């Protein structure tokens, strides 16, 4: 998981922004010549690292290592048996590495190239344009698990929360929670059909489909929420679109050209979906239920001010947590009224 974290933050330009202003163009790519004399995994990693570096591809060595390892049937280059490092590859393997590397030269994210990625120890299928789960979102999951553990200890019984995830994408958050909370149930919603399909696929892949209800739903449509199969909820969890609209053009090529912009663009102040979630929460949550959100570092103050202007919601911002880069990234909001 380290690759995407380093790649993402290396591409950031300015505090709290996911992206880069580096220019690029598909038309500049040309097919690579035959790899004469290159036959081993180590040689191929070295070759493609050099090619990527010359073309300004972020995380050049890590990208080449992941691609070569994938073709050889491993998740990481370091996990390959040392004997495979110097063993000659077949012509089919060489061709596959060339084809995958050409996609990286077009700035396709490694996660889409490989077609899978690990999140919280789960191997998830990745398909463009469904949003790729970031490493900091694993910290959001860990915070939710801590809260469930604390509540379970307080009541003296195992945690069996009913959880709603808004904007499930690949299902990373929902499936991680289900895998670590065996008594839990999850409702996962998303307005994008591609995300719903991928969450279904990942749930079946992990054999968690019996405890998750996946719904194609636009959360901005209030009438849709009257048809939820379970409720009320103990927890609402979301990594919503939170990029400020004016920052969308500054996103890195890997993000801007491959991921669904609707999963990123949060409107003028990045708050459009966040405020929809908060406005609906009192109708969906149990008494003392909680909301956990991943947000832009500029959002904690904006959310706090917005909640103060809506006392009728009976929602309080009780905690803000920083991500691994020290930025205020996660919010815990609790219902505290009727």
UniProtKB/Swiss-Prot annotation:
Compartments (UniProt record): Mitochondrion
Keyword terms: Methyltransferase, Mitochondrion, S-adenosyl-L-methionine, Transferase
InterPro entries registered for this protein in UniProt: DNA_methylase_N6_adenine_CS (IPR002052), HemK-like (IPR004556), N4/N6-MTase_EcoPI_Mod-like (IPR002295), N5-glutamine_MTase (IPR050320), PrmC_N (IPR040758), RF_methyltr_PrmC (IPR019874), SAM-dependent_MTases_sf (IPR029063), Small_mtfrase_dom (IPR007848)
Origin superkingdom: Eukaryota
GO MF, one example: protein-(glutamine-N5) methyltransferase activity
Pfam families: MTS, PrmC_N
Any Gene Ontology CC annotation: mitochondrion
Catalytic activity: L-glutaminyl-[peptide chain release factor] + S-adenosyl-L-methionine = N(5)-methyl-L-glutaminyl-[peptide chain release factor] + S-adenosyl-L-homocysteine + H(+)
Positions bound to S-adenosyl-L-methionine: 167-171, 190, 225, 239
Binding site for substrate: 239-242
GO BP annotations, alphabetical order: methylation; translational termination
EC number: 2.1.1.297
Cross-referenced PANTHER family: HEMK METHYLTRANSFERASE, MTRF1L RELEASE FACTOR GLUTAMINE METHYLTRANSFERASE
Task performed by this protein: N5-glutamine methyltransferase responsible for the methylation of the glutamine residue in the universally conserved GGQ motif of the mitochondrial translation release factors MTRF1, MTRF1L, MRPL58/ICT1 and MTRFR.
Family the UniProt entry places it in: Belongs to the protein N5-glutamine methyltransferase family.
Protein name as annotated: MTRF1L release factor glutamine methyltransferase
Native source species: Homo sapiens
């Amino acid at each position: 998981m380290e690759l995407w974290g380093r790649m993402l933050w290396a591409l950031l330009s300015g505090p709290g922004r996911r992206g880069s202003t580096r220019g690029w163009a598909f038309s500049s790519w040309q097919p690579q010549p035959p790899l004469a004399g290159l036959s081993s995994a180590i040689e191929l990693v070295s070759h493609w690292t050099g090619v990527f570096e010359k073309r300004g591809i972020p995380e050049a060595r890590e990208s080449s290592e992941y691609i070569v390892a994938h073709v050889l049937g491993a998740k990481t280059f370091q996990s390959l048996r040392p004997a495979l490092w110097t063993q000659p590859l077949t012509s089919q393997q060489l061709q596959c590495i060339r084809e995958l590397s050409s996609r990286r030269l077009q700035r396709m994210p490694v996660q889409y190239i490989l077609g899978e990625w690990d999140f919280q120890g789960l191997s998830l299928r990745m398909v463009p344009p469904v949003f790729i789960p970031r490493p900091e979102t694993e910290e959001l999951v860990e915070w939710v698990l801590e809260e469930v553990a604390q509540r379970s200890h307080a009541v003296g019984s195992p945690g069996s929360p009913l959880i709603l995830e808004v904007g499930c994408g690949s299902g990373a958050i929902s499936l991680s929670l289900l895998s670590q909370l065996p008594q839990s149930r999850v409702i996962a919603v998303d307005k994008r059909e591609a995300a719903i399909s991928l969450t279904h696929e990942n749930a079946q892949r992990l054999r968690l489909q019996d405890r998750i209800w996946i719904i194609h739903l636009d959360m901005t449509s209030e009438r849709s929420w009257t048809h939820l199969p379970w409720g009320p909820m103990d927890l609402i969890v979301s990594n919503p679109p939170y990029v400020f609209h004016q920052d969308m053009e500054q996103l890195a090529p890997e993000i801007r050209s491959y991921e669904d912009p609707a999963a990123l663009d949060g409107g003028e102040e990045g708050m459009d979906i966040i405020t929809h979630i908060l406005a609906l929460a009192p109708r969906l949550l149990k008494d003392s239920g909680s909301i956990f959100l991943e947000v832009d570092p500029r959002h904690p103050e904006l959310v706090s001010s917005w909640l103060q202007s809506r006392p009728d919601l009976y929602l309080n911002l009780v905690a803000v947590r920083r991500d691994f880069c020290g930025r205020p990234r996660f919010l815990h909001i609790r219902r505290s009224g009727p």
